[in-house]
């Protein structure tokens, strides 16, 4: 009897998952036009002529605000499954979730105190 019963599908999927990106890159190298000259080097802005330079510096507050948003968005992704299965998890999972929320509240207080949430 073959010992890897059931793993053939996984191995096949793994091989296909590795082959598809390689095939896409090789196809791009073969089919894509060579050389970038003239019009191909110009910036494209929805069919309009570009206005101003492409190298604009943004204020760091935008990045800090986005970073805080991503952190708390990921928090929601972690807390939603916990809330759905709350009745079945028990007291230990409740305490773990409270610790997780406490850490995030401390992080929010730190970001607030450092001014990461101030817009003006």
Swiss-Prot record:
Its EC number is 7.1.1.-. Coiled coil: none annotated. Pfam families: Oxidored_q4 (PF00507). The chain crosses the membrane at residues 10-30, 64-84, 89-109. It catalyses: a plastoquinone + NADH + (n+1) H(+)(in) = a plastoquinol + NAD(+) + n H(+)(out); a plastoquinone + NADPH + (n+1) H(+)(in) = a plastoquinol + NADP(+) + n H(+)(out). The keyword Transmembrane applies. The keyword Hydrolase does not apply. GO terms for molecular function: NADH dehydrogenase (ubiquinone) activity; quinone binding. Keywords: Membrane, NAD, NADP, Plastoquinone, Quinone, Thylakoid, Translocase, Transmembrane, Transmembrane helix, Transport. Signal peptide: none annotated. It is found in: Cellular thylakoid membrane. It is an enzyme of class 7 (translocase). It comes from the Bacteria. InterPro entries: NAD(P)H_OxRDtase_bac/plastid, NADH_UbQ/plastoQ_OxRdtase_su3, NDAH_ubi_oxred_su3_sf. GO terms for biological process: photosynthesis, light reaction. It is a multi-pass membrane protein. Its main location: membrane. GO terms for cellular component: NADH dehydrogenase complex; plasma membrane-derived thylakoid membrane. Belongs to the complex I subunit 3 family. NDH-1 can be composed of about 15 different subunits; different subcomplexes with different compositions have been identified which probably have different functions. NDH-1 shuttles electrons from an unknown electron donor, via FMN and iron-sulfur (Fe-S) centers, to quinones in the respiratory and/or the photosynthetic chain. The immediate electron acceptor for the enzyme in this species is believed to be plastoquinone. Couples the redox reaction to proton translocation, and thus conserves the redox energy in a proton gradient. Cyanobacterial NDH-1 also plays a role in inorganic carbon-concentration. This is NAD(P)H-quinone oxidoreductase subunit 3.
């Amino acid at each position: 009897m073959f010992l890897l019963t059931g793993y053939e599908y996984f191995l096949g999927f793994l091989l296909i998952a590795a082959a598809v990106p390689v095939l896409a890159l090789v196809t791009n190298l073969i089919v894509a036009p060579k050389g970038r000259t003239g019009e191909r080097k110009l910036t494209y802005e929805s069919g309009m002529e570009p206005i101003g330079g492409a190298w604009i510096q943004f204020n760091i507050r935008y990045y800090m605000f986005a970073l805080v948003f991503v952190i708390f968005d990921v928090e929601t992704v972690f807390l939603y499954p916990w809330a759905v299965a709350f009745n079945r998890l028990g007291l230990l999972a409740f305490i773990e979730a409270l610790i997780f929320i406490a850490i995030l509240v401390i992080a929010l207080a730190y970001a607030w105190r450092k001014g990461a949430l101030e817009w003006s």
